[in-house]
Amino acid sequence: MQILIAKDGKVVYDKSFGTQDKYSSKKVKWTDLYDVASVTKVTATLPLLMLAVGENKINLEQTLGEIDAAAKNSNKSNLKIREILAHQAGLKPWIGFYNETVNVKNARLYLDYYARKQDAERQIKVTDNIFVINTIKDTIYEDIYKSPLGRKSYEYSDLGYYIFKQKLE
């Protein structure tokens, strides 16, 4: 873990702690790089979820089926919000959502999904000059709800953050 605090454009605290993962003895250094996408799930979705809990809109003991109609008819229905946040709900660690939209062997985007210019069917900006099909979000949530559950033991999963983001928007 790394913590950096800046005030008025100046770094006032910068410290690294621990090891790079639970299997490694390699210490975290200030030069280590992180996947920003994983950080944004926690820094954007988690504060909104905390606010919803603080305002009694969501209870950590509620199940996904209680807060999300799409979860009711899935194997995710009885998962408690608390279990999901603690990464103990049995959710898969990761789903390669892009696998259906990209030819991984030659690093080519499938044109059924992507376009260089924004059009009626491709409104979601991926990066400059690349837009993805509008239904991709529905596909992602469908893939999450259809995915199998594992054992209820600690295993990091970002899938809950996708669900919470959708419910909190």
Language-model regions: role of each:
Residues 11, 18, 22, 42, ...:
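Solvent-exposed loop/turn segments at secondary-structure junctions
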Residues 8-10, 87-90, 129-135:
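Glycine-rich, acidic and aromatic/proline-enriched surface loops and short helix-turn segments
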Residues 39-46, 78, 156-161:
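Short alpha-helical patches at coil-to-helix transitions and adjacent helical residues
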Residues 33, 95-100, 104-169:
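Catalytic-site signature segments of enzymes, centered on catalytic residues
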Residues 30, 35-39, 54-104, 145-146, ...:
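Active-site helix/loop module of the DD-peptidase/beta-lactamase fold
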Residues 47-57, 162-169:
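Short glycine/serine- and small hydrophobic-enriched flexible loop segments
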